[in-house]
Design a protein with these regions (language model features):
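Conserved, mostly hydrophobic/aromatic
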Residues: 3, 45, 70, 109, ...
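Hydrophobic faces of well-ordered beta-strands that scaffold small-molecule active sites
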Residues: 48-50, 138-141, 167-169, 197-201, ...
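Structured beta-strand/loop patches that form or line metal/cofactor-binding pockets in enzymes
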Residues: 1-44, 49, 53-55, 327
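Shared catalytic-loop signature of beta/alpha-barrel
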Residues: 215, 221, 232-340, 344-347
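Metal-dependent enolase-superfamily TIM-barrel catalytic cores that perform enediolate-based chemistry
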Residues: 134-243
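Extended hydrophobic packing segments that form well-structured cores
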Residues: 349-365
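Glycine-rich, aromatic-flanked loop segments that form ligand/cofactor-binding clefts
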Residues: 101, 110-146
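Metal- or metallocofactor-binding catalytic centers and their adjacent structured scaffolds
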Residues: 41-120
Length: 365
């Protein structure tokens, strides 16, 4: 199954329910769904797809990276040698790469290659990887700080009404410490003791702030405190984890297994959240296995549709994250029921964008 062509498409698609994250750095994310879709075609006629939804722009830069740096490395190669092709791209871009734009571009191609392999075999990826088609636990995300106190609680209650047993709300940034404590207190009172509550700081605090606020929040029996400090502050992560009772988690802004080494060495972060845009399926499987070796669970960031194939076969799955941004974009969306999601049984990763999107919603910078 030799790779014969690689094509890209840039789209700007309206949200059905725009996110209200309430952080200036994420303003581009709130406006529209900017997508880069990549197609890997083989001489046998099989086409695999991958995509990127970066928060901070760079769409044309990512597209250029694919065509200028990576496509020449893959044309004429055997598509089924996915891990070897990942290493070929990694080595060829080592000077400019190792994270950022280059690894994101690699990740989209990696997902597309695996999709092609699954389609060629006529099997869903979880089956190809020796996994199970059983339903997977998924939590309700998107109780955004931009919704305000009442809006966050109302969205969480809608999730509970739909059968979710755990929700995630945001803290920090636009809220004072006292407001954060009041928001979490009221969320707990409204939901009761039987519903898990996760908190997402989006890198909004220093370690000292996280310890001060986190200590006040411990009494609310929280499932986790996510990204309390900036991604590179591993010392801060570990300092916070030592100081509060709530489990500290993170990883969505870390690239490849190399970025996770401090977490694996300390074993103080019990759950990691790698992002499929920062390594693709190939690296996320590596991360999962290395985490499992040191007793750490994995709850991949966003992209619950693609991640369902992964969680179905890794040894240490924890949660999928439901965010319904893409539900109206797929030909056959996967939708949770009562806080559970069954991975698709279609060949490959099983998700195709509606063809009309490519004509109706061209990219708008």
């Amino acid at each position: 199954m030799v790779i014969s062509d690689i094509r890209t498409h840039l789209l700007s698609v309206p949200y059905r329910d725009p996110p209200k994250i309430g952080v200036a750095d994420y303003s581009a994310l709130e406006a529209k769904i900017n997508l880069l879709v990549v197609e890997v075609e083989t001489k046998s006629g099989v086409i695999g797809t991958g995509h990127l939804h970066p928060v901070a722009g760079g769409m044309r830069t990512l597209e250029t990276c694919i065509h200028e740096m990576l496509k020449p490395l893959l044309i004429g190669e055997e598509a089924t040698n996915v891990e070897a092709l990942w290493q070929k791209m990694w080595r060829a871009t080592y000077i400019q790469g190792r994270m950022g734009i280059t690894v994101m571009a690699m990740s989209a191609l990696d997902v597309a290659l695996w999709d092609a392999v699954g389609r060629h075999a006529g099997k869903p990826l979880w089956e190809l990887w020796g996994g199970s088609g059983d339903a997977l636990p998924i939590y309700g995300s998107g109780c955004f700080r931009g919704l305000g106190h009442d809006g966050m609680i109302e969205k969480a209650k809608r999730y509970v009404d739909q059968g979710y047993t755990t929700i995630k709300m945001q803290v920090g940034h636009v809220f004072t410490e006292d407001e954060d404590v009041a928001n979490v207190r009221d969320m707990r009172q409204e939901l009761g003791s039987g519903i898990g509550i996760m908190l997402d700081v989006n890198q909004g605090w220093t370690a000292d702030e996280a310890i001060r606020v986190g200590s006040r929040l411990d009494e609310f029996d929280l499932a986790w405190l996510e990204e309390p400090v900036v991604a590179d502050d591993f010392e801060g992560y570990h300092k916070v984890a030592d100081a509060i009772q709530t489990p500290v988690v993170g990883g969505e802004n870390h690239f490849t297994h190399h970025d996770f080494k401090p977490f694996f060495a300390s074993r103080k972060i019990p759950i990691i959240q790698p992002d499929i845009m920062r390594g693709g399926y190939t690296e996320l499987k590596v991360i999962a296995n290395q985490a499992h070796d040191v007793g750490i669970k994995m709850a991949p960031h966003l992209f619950y549709q693609l991640n369902s194939l992964l969680n179905a076969c890794i040894p240490n799955p924890m949660w999928l994250e439901y965010m319904g941004w893409f539900d109206h974009l797929w030909v056959n969306p996967a939708l949770p029921e009562n806080g559970l999601l069954k991975p698709p049984t279609r060949p490959g990763h099983g998700f195709d964008f509606k063809p009309e999107l490519f004509k109706e919603f061209p990219y708008q910078a």
